[in-house]
């Protein structure tokens, strides 16, 4: 019996503690490529009280405790074998205090969740923005004192922290700030008012001295104006002198420079400056003019500032160096080992040439190992620059990785021996720079020994309590008949950025992945599933029931792929894993039976083929020659026959000349979901041939899942292009509305509509506006969008037949989406997917809420008024 495991469960609950290998492999490293050991346990506490108990337990057992926020840094420091990982992402509550101009947040809150809510009231976090805000946690960002992109006027993260709640290694809870010892509930106003700046002790200490559980941070009003400038320069000296002048006159709010790496296409000049001006309207105009005068006086070349605007508002898409999102990282598998620190602005005149000389001198070795420069980016503060030196190499190449670490050491020695001071110290470069700090490093070690004598918190980070844990880069093993190998390269493209976890920019901490909300651990979300796939390819893990649970509990909603920074087709990775597991008999029982019924009966409901069109009154529509075919689908044909009937009546009203094939089989979506690719191919081929015989040129679909299978999956499975145009019925209706040939009757007074974007219609087919064109055409009705809409829409939980094996997941997801719909004040919830419709009607029976659930096409059929019949 594992007594530690039992004690951890007593503290956090059984659902928030794991020691399963498939889970543990997802918590061994951050965005860096160097794996550490495999932890023994992962815990997800929900409160400071639970953190205290966990820390005390680890201290008593002298068990290493590694802190896990969102793990989006490039610390490149792995955990110790058998350690406890403290995943703090469930502690994500926050409270805005606009009167006192602060926000109180728990450690796991995502920065952008706070900022998204603040913006609704005209406020923003005082800490400047940047790409990391989309996915980084409050506690982690403060612990590492992250240096954001806009530090010129606003400073670094720690400059805006008012107070902290910290759990020390012995379990003592410390509150810093002016209200630290106040028993009346007053908030902290000043950080160092009680004497020593205790908050500063933990800011930047990388979790080695205590666990940050809560933080109070400053906020500010959003400026009236945000303007942008983009200049390039031929000479390094001119660029640096321009920056010094901009800094001395405080003319730009933020200054960001590029001094190496790829340049935007079609841009003249060797060096780049991006300037952001944020201020009152009149002052912003003056500051912008001052920036222009300075840049021009140093021979700057004005460029289109749209690149700067995109850099600032959409930084993680790397617009600076691209014509479109993601192309900059498109050649990954690559890892970016960072060497970063502060240096005097004028020192760039020496440091940049020195870096270039080093690269030139070692170019042959760089080429041999496929290395290249990502960039020499500089975020300028008031009087210095924060230089990032990033190099890229093939992450899956063991020799390239070893050489990459040597380059990191060389560059660290080059910069820190003369110009650079530590900033954003992380474990990746700590071995090369911490000894250079001399007595400062000794003092940090003394503090560590005093506060954490058992060295339980993040041992090895910052070279405190031992060396960093760097595991070997495992070589990919030779696959033995794995379908997964066909998408193997995709698993190495994952940047581990964490964009697949939530849609924090919507506000509040809104979830993105229903299976992650259900499964609790990273192995249930995109980043973790990719880590699982990679472990299988590298021979660290084998397919088994535990892996199957984590892959087949996915609804294939596509949210992770849609929000992936790298635009990785994660669904294709999951699909190959499903095919591998189907071949090994690991398909879950319920889905397996669905696949059997589908293959035997031509539908997933085990109904007879002869009953497929019992609902169709006008049988003359069957098997007639026509250019348009209506593909009904299994769910409308057997389960939601009213939707099928309403659809054909609507087609008749619109004057569409269409046919329905009596030999229509299931589209094959259930078979694909079950990993039965070859059987799915049979169905796809049959349906194609059936409609070819009827002279079809266009297929109209009611079910978006069927349409997605034909449009997206069929070409890949059969290796041939789709011979017909595909169109959803909502697209057809929307076009008729826009043409003026039809109109919709008015709705009763007080009708408020909201709409759920089905995953297949939205993210898979990118049909977002057609349903909204229809909804906005109902006179007398008000349309209130749910906060998560279009590409951000939360799955109802019914996708890929998940309910058959994971009913709790479906119920959870459906209920969450239902509550979001209720929050809009709607009287009617509309959707365009019969599976979603069924799920919401089941939720309605449980809640007894008055919110109606209505199929949009059925509503259109009832309300449509045809003014002109066109030949369709």
Label every PLM stretch briefly:
Residues 22-24, 28-92, 105, 125:
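Glycine-rich N-terminal segment of FAD-binding domains in flavoprotein oxidoreductases
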Residues 93-96, 107, 112, 116-248:
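FAD-binding subdomain of flavoenzyme oxidoreductases
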């Amino acid at each position: 019996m594992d007594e530690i495991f039992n004690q951890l469960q007593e503290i956090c609950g059984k659902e928030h503690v794991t020691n399963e290998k498939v889970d543990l492999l997802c918590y061994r490293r951050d965005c860096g490529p160097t794996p550490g050991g495999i932890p023994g346990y992962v815990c997800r506490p929900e409160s400071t009280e639970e953190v205290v108990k966990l820390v005390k337990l680890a201290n008593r057992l002298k068990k290493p405790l590694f802190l896990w926020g969102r793990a989006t840094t490039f610390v490149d420091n792995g955990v110790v074998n058998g350690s406890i990982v403290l995943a703090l992402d469930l502690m994500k509550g926050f409270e805005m205090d606009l009167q006192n101009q602060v926000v109180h947040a728990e450690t796991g809150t995502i920065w952008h969740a706070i900022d998204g809510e603040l913006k609704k009231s005209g406020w923003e976090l005082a800490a400047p923005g940047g790409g990391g805000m989309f996915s980084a946690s409050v506690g982690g960002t403060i612990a590492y004192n992250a240096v954001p992109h806009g530090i010129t006027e606003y400073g670094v993260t720690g400059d805006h922290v008012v107070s902290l709640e910290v759990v020390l290694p012995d379990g003592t809870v410390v509150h810093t700030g002016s209200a630290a010892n106040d028993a009346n509930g007053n908030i902290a106003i000043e950080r160092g008012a009680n004497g020593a700046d205790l908050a500063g002790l933990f800011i930047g200490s990388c979790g080695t001295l205590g666990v940050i559980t809560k933080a109070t941070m400053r906020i500010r009003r959003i400026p009236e104006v945000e303007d942008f400038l983009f200049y390039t320069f031929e000479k390094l000296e001119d660029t640096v002198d321009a920056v010094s002048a901009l800094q001395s006159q405080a003319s730009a709010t933020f200054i960001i420079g590029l001094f190496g790496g790829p340049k935007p296409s079609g841009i003249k000049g060797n060096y780049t400056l991006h300037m952001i001006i944020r201020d009152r309207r009149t002052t912003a105009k003056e500051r912008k003019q001052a920036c222009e005068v300075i840049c021009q006086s140093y021979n700057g070349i004005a460029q289109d500032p749209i690149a700067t605007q995109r850099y600032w508002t959409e930084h993680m898409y790397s617009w600076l160096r691209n014509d479109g999102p993601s192309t900059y990282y498109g050649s990954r598998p690559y890892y970016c080992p960072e060497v970063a620190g502060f240096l005097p602005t004028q020192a760039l005149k020496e440091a940049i040439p020195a870096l270039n000389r080093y690269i030139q001198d070692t170019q042959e070795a760089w080429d041999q190992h496929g290395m290249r420069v990502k960039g020499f980016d500089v975020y300028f503060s008031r009087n210095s620059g924060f230089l990032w030196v990033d190099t890229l190499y093939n992450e899956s190449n063991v020799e390239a990785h070893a050489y990459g670490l040597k380059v990191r050491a060389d560059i660290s020695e080059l910069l820190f021996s003369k110009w650079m001071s530590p900033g954003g110290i992380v474990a990746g470069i700590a071995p090369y720079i911490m000894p250079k700090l001399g007595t400062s490093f000794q003092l940090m070690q003394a503090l560590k020994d005093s506060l954490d004598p058992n060295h339980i918190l993040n041992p090895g980070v910052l070279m405190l309590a031992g060396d960093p844990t760097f595991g070997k880069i495992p070589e990919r093993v030779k696959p033995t008949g794995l379908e997964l190998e066909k998408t193997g390269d995709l698993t190495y493209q994952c940047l581990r950025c964490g964009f697949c976890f939530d849609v924090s920019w919507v506000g509040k901490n809104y979830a993105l992945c229903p299976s992650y909300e259900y499964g609790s651990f990273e192995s249930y979300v995109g980043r973790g599933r990719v880590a699982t796939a990679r472990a299988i390819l590298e021979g660290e893990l084998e397919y088994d029931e535990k892996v199957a649970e984590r892959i087949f509990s996915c609804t294939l909603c596509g949210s992770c792929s849609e929000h992936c920074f790298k635009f990785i087709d994660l669904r294709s990775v999951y699909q190959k894993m499903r095919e591998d597991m189907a071949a090994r008999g690991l398909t879950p029982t319920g889905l397996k039976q669905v696949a059997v019924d589908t293959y035997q009966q031509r539908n997933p409901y085990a109904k007879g083929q002869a009953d497929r069109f019992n609902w169709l009154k006008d049988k003359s529509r069957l098997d007639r020659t026509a250019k348009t075919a209506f593909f009904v689908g299994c769910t409308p044909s057997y389960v939601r026959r009213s939707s099928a009937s309403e659809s054909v009546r609507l087609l008749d009203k619109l004057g569409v000349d269409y046919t329905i094939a009596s030999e229509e089989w299931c589209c094959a979506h259930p078979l694909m979901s079950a990993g039965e690719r070859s059987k799915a191919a049979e169905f796809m081929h049959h349906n194609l041939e059936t409609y070819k015989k009827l002279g079809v040129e266009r297929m109209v679909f009611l079910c978006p899942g069927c349409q997605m299978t034909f449009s997206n999956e069929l070409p890949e499975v059969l290796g041939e292009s789709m011979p017909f145009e595909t169109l959803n019925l909502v697209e057809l209706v929307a076009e008729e509305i826009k043409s003026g040939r039809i109109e919709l009757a008015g709705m009763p007074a007080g009708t408020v509509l909201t709409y759920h974007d089905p995953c297949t219609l939205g993210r898979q087919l990118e049909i977002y506006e057609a349903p909204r064109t229809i909804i906005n055409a109902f006179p007398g009705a008000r349309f209130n969008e749910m906060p998560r809409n279009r590409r951000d829409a939360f799955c109802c939980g019914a996708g890929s037949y998940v309910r058959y094996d994971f009913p709790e997941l479906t119920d959870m997801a459906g209920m969450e989406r239902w509550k979001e719909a209720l929050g809009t004040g709607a009287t009617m919830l509309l959707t365009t997917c019969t599976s979603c419709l069924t799920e919401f009607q089941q939720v309605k029976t449980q809640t007894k809420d008055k919110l109606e659930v209505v199929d949009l096409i059925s509503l259109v059929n009832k309300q449509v008024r045809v003014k002109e019949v066109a030949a369709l």
